[in-house]
Amino acid sequence: MTQRPTLWRQLQKARGRVEDRPHALWSATAHNAGKAGTRRRQETQVQWKKLALGALVVAGAAAVGGWFSLDKETRGLLATFPTNRDLLFWSEPQRDAAFRALDRIPLLARSHMVPASGTPSPLPPGEPLPLRTDINAFMAGQRSAALLIVQGGKLRLERYGLDFDGAGRWTSFSVAKSFTSTLVGAALKDGYIRSLDDKVSDYIPDLKGSAYDDVSVRQLLTMTSGVQWNEDYADPQSDVARFNNHQPEAGQEALVSYMRQLPRAAPPGTRWLYSTGETNLVGTLVQQATGKPLATYLAEKVWGPAGMEHDATWLVSKTGQEVGGCCIQASPRDYAHMGLFILNGAKVDGQSIVPDGWWEAATTKQADIGRPGHGYGYQWWTNDDGSYAARGIFGQGIFIDPQRELVIVTNANWAGGACDPAAMKAREQFYREVQQAVDAEQQRSKD
């Protein structure tokens, strides 16, 4: 069921039928290249949109009891309300507000609900893990909203920042990719997908005749399709920046409509290229194969069985399909639950939801990414020491180390942008320090 927050009803009378004209609110004209005169007109249009949209939202809130009747997160988002969907270009305060509330404002994005488990399983507390790291300094440098360490099945560190707490939801960005790939494994075991060597177009007929016609499910999972894509987060003309504003062809899903027009750059299986668009297609493939929305299948195969403590949401495209490559909103503890679920083989009543051998393949290097010691599996970033991670822009992550029974969850809003090199390096160093702390503790227990 599409998530319709209370604010949706609060805004209906004030805004009329604005949602029927998405181009009026969701354009990214302020960032588009063009002649100086055109650019000035575009910037003026955006300013008028911001004024109109701000008045619209405040009027809607006031009409049903006023600003202070809204929850803190929604007030924070409205106070810095972005004028478009191009979050790659939002200001730091806008991101701070929005990352905890993307699913609160349907004018920005709509979502489907993933209900909490009927049998929630709170994380048991453990002894604090002795760390040399100054946690306060590390979190300040990362601009962390949440930092959790689960080791040996127990919660050994749980800290929050940016005026966020564990009761809220924080967006996943590309961490969702690893959730989507897990649903591929589930669909394979359930018989909805016959083989990873099947053609993608067997499941998404609208891709027939496109560059994806001869691409296998496996190649899509490992981002080795050979289809051209630009994932440059700093470029407003990149595919990752433009596809949200694409107007789909009549009768086609928005995500498929954009991807089917892309040209081939290399033969299938010969080159790895990171592409959020390809994971969007993975999500579409699962939906087409199972006949179920991704949110429904996630609730059935993961959220319920794993004992998730809170509701989650999954943002949907203009045509109403969950965006497989991005944007689950969940509590930090439930991200930790997901890490534990994967660490323990995604088992329900002793049986894994994925086929035998799935995790060995999914979490080890299937594609060379050009970094010694690292690779890419089935939508997981892999390390030669056996650890692996789900990663999202601006500092989202679930790091899993089976050898040490370790899960680390990070939610953040990096100051240096989507792929802040300094913040990324500091996080990798933190992972190593946690691993060393676990090793030292285990050694002391043996002595």
Where are these regions (language model features)?
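N-terminal leader/targeting segments and the immediately adjacent pre-domain N-terminus
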Residues: W26-D165, I193, T222, R260, ...
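Catalytic-site signature segments of enzymes, centered on catalytic residues
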Residues: G166-A167, D232-A234, A241-T319, C326
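Active-site-proximal alpha-helical segments within enzyme catalytic domains
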Residues: E278-L285, G324-K347, Q396-N413
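Active-site helix/loop module of the DD-peptidase/beta-lactamase fold
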Residues: T171, D190-Q228, Q261, Q288-C326, ...
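Active-site-proximal loop and beta-strand segments within enzyme catalytic domains
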Residues: N136-A137, D165-A167, A187-R271
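Short, low-complexity intrinsically disordered segments enriched in A/P/G/S/L with frequent Arg
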Residues: Q3-R4, R21, A30, R39
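Active-site Gly/Thr loop motif
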Residues: E309-A312, D356-V407
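Active-site SXXK
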Residues: G153, W170-L196, L220, V282-V286, ...
